[in-house]
């Protein structure tokens, strides 16, 4: 980063606004420049302004204690480290601004501002305002104190401390290296190079080690807190689960039988319900079929009306066309009449428009000469008005200027009078305060002595309070020590009692554990598992036998149903063959009979004559049967054919039903065979399971004897025997567990007491140390009190003469400092007022003389301008009087435009009237043509309408239907016939389907009744089944609870296994951290910090030696033991010397080399293009000064610009470019940039 400019106002002694621009000559081309001035002139204030603008702090504010207070002009005290303390006394506002280039290459402006309330000198200090903006567009990036500091640090890459050691090397910051001892040098090195990070790392390593140790101890404590079930308890739980599982299995077969019986009852009841429902459905379908008579009649009428739709539509359309033609003829006649009237009106309007156009044209020509004269006068009047307005404006401006000048003259005269009065008042006030002038002159020292006296009094009171507090703490610590000793004695007695109780429990536990080892419980659990397997094998065999019997019954029933279905299928096929044969036999005769009864045959028979050949077959004989007998024969043949078709359809339905029943029966038979096979397989598996498990059970020592084949009685006896053994073992294990629990609790209580005893001892030791410390504090407090009292008495003695002159006798009197300050302030105010009045009078004299001359000149100019304005107004009025009679005073252009508009409007009206007349003539001709055409169309439509009505009447007569009936049928919604037809078909199909369903349901009911129902009623069966299921549910809950207890124990065991892994991992991690802690860790962080500081000091010495080679080649720095520094004297054979043995000039050069090295190391890789050194060069001789300047100038080749603050004249003479700070009196200073070209 690079500093581009520094600006400010009212920063300490720099009262006037100032700006130092490093981008313009001569500073822009100067690699080295000096900031010069007398001591106290304000050289360092420039650097304060730079730091305030960038970071809101300044080096001089950080030097003192932040708890110190300083008085403010507003009557309050502020911290000595408050940045507002930089604000100049007597100033209402002050600011500092820095323009700099950031790491990104862009330019930014940082600003700091302090102000007082209401911008008054006596106002209360307000909160500091800070801002950061981008220079190129003025965009504000931050406007809050913390945000500005963070943004500046991000843009420059430097924190405030890094800025102070990289860009600004303030007074005393680097010479402290040579003055400090090893401990102080470590602190300074950590401060200026940022190696405090390593101290933090060392502390973190120590804390992490302690955390790992605590985590390891916590895991060990967690492992000791868990309690597990022993093997006997787990075996007992397993036995109870097996017993309840066996009982559940035994009840399963009975539940299956009861469920099957209830299912048979439900199937019979369902079959009866379905027969009843099918009968009800058939009755409902037949009733709906009977109700459809009116619908059938309506459908017949709709079918007869269908051919009449077209004639009806044609007649309606003809009537509509006739109505439309008549309406068109009437409208055409009316239009012809209206067109004739419009033609007459348009002819009259055309005549009137022609007359008006002639009249307006003549009037327009008559006004021509008048308009020309009026236009000439209008131009002259406009020119005269402009000239008159300009003259009036000039007169008003000169009058206002003269009045302003006269007011300024009066203001200066009044100011002169006020300044004279102020000078007289100040002189009188100084005369009144002449006796207090010495007090004002000695006030700074007197104020410091008073402050020191107050501080001594406060220190004495604080020391006395501290001594009393130490005595009170000593008494409290003694009482706490006595209480701790009593608690320790109680815990020791309790620990002895617990040790005796633990020994007694151990004696009672030993014989029980010997008689009931954990292996016994495990053996019983294994026997229980084996018996459970035998129980499952026995249950599986029983269930397989039951399933096999059921499958055999199902197979027999399926075979019977299949045989019956095949017989029904054969009979249905025979019926279908007979019906189809009968249909085929009746088809030919019926077709011949229909042909004989047709209209064509009847017409041909009427043309036959005896002896003439038949035109069809050529026969000469023509027997003619009676038509009535022939019709009767055809009707009988048609009825027989319909009956045959019905029989064929019934046979097809029966065939389909028989085939479905046969397929269903065959599927049931296949499923029954598969069920028999699975039952056989399951029975064989059950016998094999019994055979595999029984030898293993018999081989166990505690197991009862069992036969080689499944035997329910023997198995039940074995389970009873096992239950008794497990009950006895569970009781013994419960007693062992209780004793172990009591023993563990006793050990836990003893451990708690041991920790308490350790805590008691630690408390006693801590209290002893605190008592010693408290006694020491009391002695120190008494010593401080004595010292403060002596300092107070000495200051009171020193203050006595000055207080006596001021009429005061007690330096600790309330309000003394305020009274003395008020007197001193009054003297200072009077002196300041006198000086200000004299300065004001000197400045006002030439201003007042010039104001009087300006007033006379302005008055003469105003009078001349007023006369010119009056002349111009007269000329303008004469022209207006000449123009007023013409055109009634109206503007010429407006009057001419109005008459021209009237002429043009008359011409347009004449043209429009002619066009309207032509349009009306054409409209009349078109209306007459339309009237003739519509009359012809109406005649033709009437003829067509009569023909359509005649066709419709003939069609209605042929269909035996009236026009009203046809209209009602046609008005029905579209699709009515189809809906009626579909509804009737659905009713007929519903009756057929209901009859078929009723027959099927009756067949199903008969089959179920043939199988027979259980003897026991459904209510009794349901009650028995509910009791069995409730018992099974209870056993399932008990099994679940017991299983959950086993699962919890297993989970605890698994958790403990994981805890062991965690404990081992924690131990390994603790070992690692202990090794790291041994290397670099420490509670205070010193271990690693010293290592880092030693390395950093080596690098710092290396950088410093490079600069020292240019500044003073005789010496070379080196690090001695730990962090101490020595110099090697090359002129003395590289002899090592202490830094304190260096002369003043040599010491400064070494300090300067260290400062430059620190500036290289302090920026975390950020290059600082500007460097300020605030350190005196007065200790250097001419040669050393030249070397120092040459070394600083070489930094320009590295891209740096170096500024040196110094009041040494030799330094100023050797540096051409300077920022000179000069005192101006009254605590004010000003600055100026000096150099080549300025």
UniProtKB/Swiss-Prot annotation:
Stretches with biased composition (Low complexity): 661-673
GO molecular function ontology, one term from the record: ATP hydrolysis activity
GO biological processes: DNA recombination; DNA replication; double-strand break repair
Ligand binding (ATP): 37-44
Entries under PANTHER family matching the protein: ABC TRANSPORTER ABCH.3
Entry keywords, A to Z: ATP-binding, Coiled coil, DNA recombination, DNA replication, Endonuclease, Exonuclease, Hydrolase, Nuclease, Nucleotide-binding
UniProt KW DNA repair keyword: no
Organism: Rhodobacter capsulatus (strain ATCC BAA-309 / NBRC 16581 / SB1003)
Similarity-based family: Belongs to the SMC family. SbcC subfamily.
Ranges where the record places region Disordered: 661-713
Coiled coil regions, renumbered to chain: 395-438, 466-487, 521-600, 724-770, 901-943, 1019-1052
Oligomer and partners: Heterodimer of SbcC and SbcD.
Highest rank taxon of the organism: Bacteria
Annotated protein name in UniProt: Nuclease SbcCD subunit C
Task performed by this protein: SbcCD cleaves DNA hairpin structures. These structures can inhibit DNA replication and are intermediates in certain DNA recombination reactions. The complex acts as a 3'->5' double strand exonuclease that can open hairpins. It also has a 5' single-strand endonuclease activity.
Gene name in the database record: sbcC
């Amino acid at each position: 980063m690079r500093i581009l400019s520094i600006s400010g106002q009212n920063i300490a002694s720099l009262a006037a606004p100032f700006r130092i621009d490093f981008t313009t000559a001569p500073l822009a081309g100067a690699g080295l420049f000096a900031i010069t001035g007398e001591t106290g002139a304000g050289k360092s204030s420039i650097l304060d302004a730079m730091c305030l603008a960038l970071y809101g702090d300044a080096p001089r504010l950080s030097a003192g204690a932040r708890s110190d207070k300083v008085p403010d002009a507003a009557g309050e005290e502020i911290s000595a480290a408050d940045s507002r303390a930089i604000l100049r006394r007597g100033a209402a506002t002050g600011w500092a601004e820095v323009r700099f280039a950031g790491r990104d290459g862009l330019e930014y402006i940082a600003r700091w501002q302090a102000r007082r309330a209401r911008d008054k000198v006596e106002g209360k200090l307000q909160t500091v305002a800070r801002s950061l903006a981008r220079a190129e567009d003025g965009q504000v990036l931050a406007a809050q104190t913390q945000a500005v500091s963070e943004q500046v640090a991000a843009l420059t890459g430097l924190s405030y401390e890094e800025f102070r050691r990289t860009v600004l090397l303030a007074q005393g910051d680097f010479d402290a290296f040579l003055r400090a001892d090893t401990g102080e040098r470590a602190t300074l090195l950590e401060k200026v190079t940022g190696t405090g990070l390593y101290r933090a790392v060392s502390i973190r390593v120590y804390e992490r080690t302690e955390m790992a140790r605590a985590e390891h101890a916590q895991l060990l404590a967690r492992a000791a807190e868990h309690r597990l079930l022993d093997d006997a308890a787990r075996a007992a739980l397993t036995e109870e689960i097996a017993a309840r599982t066996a009982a559940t299995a035994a009840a399963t077969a009975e539940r299956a039988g009861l469920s099957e019986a209830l299912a048979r009852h439900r199937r019979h009841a369902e079959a009866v319900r379905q027969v009843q429902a099918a009968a009800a459905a058939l009755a409902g379908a037949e009733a709906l079929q009977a109700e459809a008579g009116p619908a059938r009649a309506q459908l017949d009428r709709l079918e007869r009306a269908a051919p009449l739709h077209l004639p009806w539509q044609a007649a309606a359309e003809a009537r509509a066309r006739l109505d439309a033609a008549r309406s068109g003829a009437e409208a055409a006649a009316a239009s012809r009449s209206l067109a004739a009237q419009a033609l007459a009106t348009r002819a009259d309007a055309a005549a009137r428009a022609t007359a008006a156009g002639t009249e307006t044209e003549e009037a327009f020509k008559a006004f021509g000469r008048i308009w020309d004269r009026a236009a000439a006068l209008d131009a002259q009047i406009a020119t005269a008005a402009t000239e008159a307005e300009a003259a009036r404006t000039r007169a008003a401006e000169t009058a206002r200027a003269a009045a302003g000048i006269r007011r300024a003259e009066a203001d200066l005269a009044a100011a002169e009078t006020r300044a004279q009065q102020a000078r007289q008042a100040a002189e009188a006030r100084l005369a009144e305060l002449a006796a207090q002038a010495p007090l004002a002159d000695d006030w700074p020292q007197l104020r410091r002595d008073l402050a020191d006296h107050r501080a001594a009094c406060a220190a004495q009171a604080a020391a006395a309070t501290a001594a009393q507090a130490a005595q009170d703490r000593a008494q409290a610590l003694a009482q706490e020590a006595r209480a701790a000793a009593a608690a320790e004695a109680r815990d020791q007695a309790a620990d002895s009692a617990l040790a005796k109780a633990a020994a007694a429990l151990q004696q009672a536990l030993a014989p029980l554990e010997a008689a009931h080892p954990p292996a016994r419980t495990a053996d019983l659990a294994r026997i229980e598992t084996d018996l459970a397997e035998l129980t499952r094998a026995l249950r599986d065999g029983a269930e397989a036998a039951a399933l096999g019997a059921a499958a055999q019954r199902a197979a027999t029933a399926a075979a019977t149903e299949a045989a019956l279905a095949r017989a029904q299928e054969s009979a249905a096929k025979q019926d279908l063959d007979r019906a189809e044969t009968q249909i085929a036999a009746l088809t030919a005769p019926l077709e011949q009979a229909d042909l004989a009864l047709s209209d064509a045959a009847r017409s041909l028979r009427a043309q036959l004559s005896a002896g003439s050949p038949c035109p069809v077959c050529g026969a000469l004989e023509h027997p003619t049967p009676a038509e009535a007998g022939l019709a009767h024969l055809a009707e009988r043949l048609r009825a027989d054919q319909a009956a045959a078709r019905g029989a064929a359809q019934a046979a097809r339905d029966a065939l389909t039903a028989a085939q479905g029943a046969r397929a269903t029966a065959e599927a049931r038979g296949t499923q029954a065979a598969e069920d028999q096979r699975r039952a056989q397989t399951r029975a064989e598996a059950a016998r094999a399971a019994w055979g595999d498990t029984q030898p293993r059970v018999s081989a166990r020592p505690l197991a009862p004897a069992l036969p080689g084949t499944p035997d329910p009685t023997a198995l039940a006896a074995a389970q009873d025997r096992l239950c008794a053994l497990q009950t006895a073992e569970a009781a013994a294990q419960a007693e062992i567990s209780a004793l172990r629990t009591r023993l563990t609790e006793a050990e836990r209580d003893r451990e708690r007491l041991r920790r308490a005893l350790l805590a008691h001892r630690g408390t006693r030791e801590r209290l002893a140390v605190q008592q010693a410390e408290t006694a020491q504090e009391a002695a120190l407090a008494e010593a401080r009190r004595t010292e403060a009292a002596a300092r107070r008495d000495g200051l009171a003695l020193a203050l006595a003469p000055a207080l006596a002159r001021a009429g005061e006798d007690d330096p600790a009197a309330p309000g003394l400092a305020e009274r003395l300050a008020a007197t001193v302030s009054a003297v200072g105010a009077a002196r300041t007022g006198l000086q200000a009045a004299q300065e004001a009078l000197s400045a006002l004299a030439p201003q007042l003389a010039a104001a009087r001359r300006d007033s006379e000149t302005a008055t003469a100019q105003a009078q001349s301008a007023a006369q010119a304005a009056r002349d111009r107004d007269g000329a303008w009025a004469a022209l207006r009087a000449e123009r007023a009679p013409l055109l009634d005073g109206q503007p010429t252009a407006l009057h001419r435009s109005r008459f021209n508009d009237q002429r043009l409007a008359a011409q347009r009206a004449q043209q429009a009237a002619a066009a309207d007349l032509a349009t009306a003539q054409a409209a009349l001709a078109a209306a007459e043509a339309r009237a003739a055409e519509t009359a012809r169309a109406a005649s033709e439509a009437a003829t067509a309408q009569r023909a359509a009505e005649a066709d419709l009447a003939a069609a209605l007569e042929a269909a035996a239907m009236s026009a009203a009936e046809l209209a009602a049928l046609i008005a029905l919604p579209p699709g009515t016939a189809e809906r009626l037809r579909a509804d009737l078909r659905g009713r007929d199909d519903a009756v057929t389907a209901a009859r078929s369903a009723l027959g099927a349901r009756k067949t199903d009911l008969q089959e179920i009744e043939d199988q027979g129902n259980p003897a026991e009623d459904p209510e009794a069966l349901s009650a028995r089944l509910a009791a069995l299921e409730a018992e099974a549910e209870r056993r399932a809950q008990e099994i679940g609870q017991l299983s959950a207890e086993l699962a919890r124990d297993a989970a605890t065991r698994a958790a403990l296994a994981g805890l062991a892994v965690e404990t081992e991992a924690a131990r390994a991690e603790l070992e690692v951290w202990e090794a790291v802690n041994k290397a670099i860790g420490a509670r205070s962080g010193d271990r690693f910090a010293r290592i880092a500081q030693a390395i950093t000091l080596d690098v710092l010495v290396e950088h410093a030696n490079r600069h020292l080679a240019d500044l003073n080649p005789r010496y070379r720095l080196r690090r001695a033991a730990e962090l101490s520094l020595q110099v090697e004297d090359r002129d003395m054979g590289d002899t090592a010397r202490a830094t304190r043995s260096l002369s003043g000039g040599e010491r400064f050069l070494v300090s300067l080399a260290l400062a430059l090295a620190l500036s290289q190391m302090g920026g975390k890789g950020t290059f600082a293009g500007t460097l300020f050194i605030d350190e005196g060069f007065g200790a250097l001789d001419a040669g050393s000064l030249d070397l120092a300047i040459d070394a600083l100038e070489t930094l320009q080749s590295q891209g740096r610009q170096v500024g040196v603050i110094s009041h040494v004249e030799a330094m100023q003479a050797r540096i051409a470019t300077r920022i000179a700070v000069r005192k101006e009196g009254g605590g004010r200073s000003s600055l100026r940039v000096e150099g080549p070209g300025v």
